Regions:
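N-terminal intrinsically disordered, cationic/polar leader segments
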Residues: 1-37, 41-44, 48-55, 62, ...
Length: 130
């Protein structure tokens, strides 16, 4: 238990020093990781863990929604709002119906978002590679 608390403290501190661009990258990576786990537990019939990881993924999309800047982001922010809301809807449907295909859709969207984010912000993200 002590190691788990130390890890959580490390994670909390590491997010305090990351740039907003790196944090968004980490959120997209978290979506991919949690969706994969939700799908695995869905296929295994472990309802409790499936729900846990779907909820974690939904929480990330909610956080991404909360950080959108409509003044600076304009049409892109509006588009992302609809996209994120649709992913939350798909996750909810996947949770209720145990439909792994809906999780696959969310995974594919998140992969595209992560790839685009990395491409647009390549220069700043390179600072975190070393």
């Amino acid at each position: 238990m002590k190691n788990n608390n130390a890890y959580e403290l490390y994670q909390a501190n590491s997010t305090m020093v990351e740039s907003p661009i790196k944090l968004v990258e980490m959120l997209y990576e978290g979506i991919l990781r949690f969706c994969a786990q939700a799908k695995r537990y869905m296929e295994a019939g472990d309802i409790e863990k499936k729900v846990y990881f779907i909820n974690r993924t939904t929480d990330i999309f909610t956080e991404l929604l909360n950080t959108l800047d409509y003044e600076r982001g304009g049409d892109v922010a509006t588009y992302l709002t609809g996209l994120y809301m649709h992913q939350i809807k798909l996750l909810t449907q996947a949770n209720v119906t145990n439909d792994t295909q809906k999780i696959d859709i969310v995974i594919n969207v998140a992969k595209g978002l992560l790839e685009a984010w990395r491409e647009v912000n390549a220069d700043e993200l390179m600072q975190y590679e070393s």
